[in-house]
Regions:
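Active-site anion-handling motifs in enzyme catalytic cores
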Residues: 1-174
Length: 174
C-alpha cells in the first residue's frame, strides 16, 4: 500500500491530477494500492475523494474517524506515505515509513529538514514525474537505513519530551 495524507490548501487543485498520476504509477509499477488516510475529519476526505475520482486503479479511503493509535497503525503499514498533512508525515516517519512531503508551509519544510529528508516538493509546483521519482526512491529500499535512523531519533526525542514534562510536573508541586 501507498498512503496519502492530503488536505485542502491553496494550490491543491492544480496538484490533484499530478497526485493521481503518481498514485496510478505506484500501483502500475510497484503494485501499491493507494490508501487515503485522513487526519482531520471530515475535511481531509474531500481531497481524497477528488484524487480517487481521477484514479484508474483500485483505492481505499479511511472514511470513519479512527483513534489516533489506529491511524498511526494504518500509516505504519504503508510502503511509503505521500503527504501534505504534516501529521501524516510525522506519524509515518516516526514508524519508520519513508515519506514524500508536498509542502505548503514552512512547518512542513521545517519538519522534513529536521529529519534530514530529501524527499520534499513544493505543493505549488508538484509534478507527477518528480513524485514518481521520489516514490521510486522510497520504495527501492535506498532510504531504509536513513528512515530507520530517523524513526529512532524521533522516538528518542519523544522520550526526552516525556522526561521533561514529568520533571516540570514534579517542579509544579501539584
Amino acid at each position: 500500500y501507498i498512503g496519502f495524507g492530503l488536505r485542502n490548501w491553496k494550490g491543491l487543485d492544480d496538484a490533484l491530477p499530478e497526485i493521481a498520476a503518481a498514485a496510478d504509477y505506484a500501483y502500475e509499477k510497484h503494485g501499491l494500492t493507494p490508501v487515503f488516510v485522513p487526519i482531520e475529519f471530515p475535511s481531509d476526505l474531500m481531497p481524497a475523494e477528488r484524487v480517487g475520482a481521477l484514479l484508474h486503479c483500485p483505492w481505499h479511503a479511511v472514511r470513519i474517524r479512527q483513534p489516533i493509535e489506529t491511524t498511526i497503525g494504518i500509516l505504519a503499514r504503508m510502503k511509503t506515505v505521500v503527504g501534505i498533512r504534516l501529521h501524516s508525515l510525522m506519524f509515518s516517519a516516526g514508524q519508520g515509513v519513508p515519506v514524500v512531503g508536498m509542502s505548503y508551509d514552512i512547518k512542513v519544510d521545517g519538519f522534513l529538514k529536521y529529519i534530514g529528508s530529501r524527499t520534499c516538493l513544493q505543493l505549488s509546483s508538484v509534478r507527477a514525474d518528480e513524485l514518481c521519482r521520489l516514490i521510486d526512491e522510497c520504495v527501492s529500499g535506498a532510504l531504509d537505513s536513513e528512515v530507520h535512523r530517523t524513526a529512532e531519533m524521533l522516538r528518542d526525542r519523544e522520550q526526552e519530551n516525556v522526561k521533561g514534562a514529568a520533571a516540570l510536573l514534579r517542579l509544579s508541586g501539584d
